[in-house]
Regions:
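A cross-family acyltransferase "interaction/gating" segment
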Residues: 133-135, 183-267
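A transmembrane-helix-recognition feature enriched in membrane-embedded lipid enzymes
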Residues: 23-91, 136-141
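Soluble, non-transmembrane catalytic domains of enzymes that act on hydrophobic metabolites at membranes
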Residues: 2-29, 84-94, 167, 182, ...
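Soluble extracytoplasmic domains of inner/organellar membrane proteins
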Residues: 154, 161-165, 169-189, 194
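Generic beta-sheet signal
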Residues: 125, 146, 174, 207-209
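Catalytic core of membrane glycerolipid acyltransferases/transacylases, capturing the structured
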Residues: 52-64, 84, 99-151
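Residue-level preference for the first positions of well-ordered beta-strands
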Residues: 98-100, 168-174, 203
Length: 285
């Protein structure tokens, strides 16, 4: 099943800002021809900062306390950012509303996409918490952090995931452990969180995300590998290049059924990781 998503404007904090920015956006375009790239970058960057500030105000005013409330706040925020950055997307398959979701990982936009389509809980490496903007956003939304090699980290992650499952929220994680540049559909999967999900007897659905540049950006020499997928650049350097894009379209595919792990995978986490990776890659074909 395909579902075309047009991120509609929601009410509440930020509605006036949407109108102001949309008017400015129209002023920056003349008969379909965008203005110079530096101006677009400044406009988009200012818009993103404003959206972030509005989300902060909403968080202070509403003070979400439960994990479900925080996940709902993050979902609204991510939908606004995607709309504000002219990122459209469609969803193929039924959206998982519970259990675990394993996905490929290309860029920080993956997080926005997974959250925008419905509230969810993320499991992420501890380094994300130290990342400007994204770290604060993830912490306030109830993200479960995993510190590799730290004593008790696996137990804490399992406990956090269990709370998400009990709250009826889908728990999303990226087993690659880092972002790739798209040279392969999915890099090797780490086995820890997959094994914990199996031990908790929770279902696990595969997801695959891909991106498509606009014809204008392709003509301008932009590439997914350099301008969308997040490789070795610093976050700020990559963001500055990204905000110069005209538009971007994403597709997120979900498997129709949960992953059916073999008996061997149930008893061997490495085999389980390989089977989960195969399920994700199958969605790229």
């Amino acid at each position: 099943m395909g579902l075309e998503r047009d991120q509609g404007r929601d009410s509440g904090p930020g509605k006036l800002a949407w109108l102001e920015f949309d008017t400015l956006g129209e002023a920056l375009t003349l008969e379909g021809t965008s203005v110079l790239n530096p101006v677009r970058k400044i406009y988009r960057a200012a818009k993103a900062i404003t959206l972030f500030l509005l989300a902060s105000v909403e968080l202070i005013l509403t003070q979400p306390r439960t994990r479900a409330e925080r996940a709902a706040w993050l979902s609204r925020f991510c939908a606004r950012v995607l709309r504000g950055m002219d990122i459209t997307f469609d969803v193929v398959g039924d959206i998982p509303m519970s259990g675990a979701v394993v996905s490929n990982h290309l860029t920080y936009l993956d997080i926005l996409l997974h959250s925008a389509i419905r509230p969810c809980v993320f499991v992420s490496k501890m380094e994300l918490r130290k990342t400007p903007l994204l770290g604060w956003m993830s912490m306030m939304s109830g993200t479960v952090y995993v510190a590799r090699g730290a004593g008790g980290s696996a137990a804490k992650a399992a406990e956090g995931m269990a709370k998400g499952f009990r709250d009826g929220l889908p728990v999303v994680f990226f087993p690659e452990g880092t972002t790739g540049v798209g040279d392969v559909p999915a890099m090797s999967f780490r086995s820890g969180l997959i094994a914990q999900t199996i031990e908790a007897e929770e279902s696990m659905r595969a997801a695959f995300i891909s991106y498509r540049l606009s014809e204008k950006d392709v003509a301008a020499g932009k590439t997914l590998r350099k301008d969308v997928h997040w490789g070795p650049e610093t976050l700020w350097a990559h963001l500055w290049g990204f905000v110069g894009l005209h538009t971007l379209h994403a597709t997120i595919k979900f498997a129709d059924e949960p992953i059916q792990f073999t008996d061997a995978a149930v008893h061997d986490r490495k085999i389980a990781a390989e089977e989960a990776r195969a399920a994700v890659i199958a969605l790229s074909l």
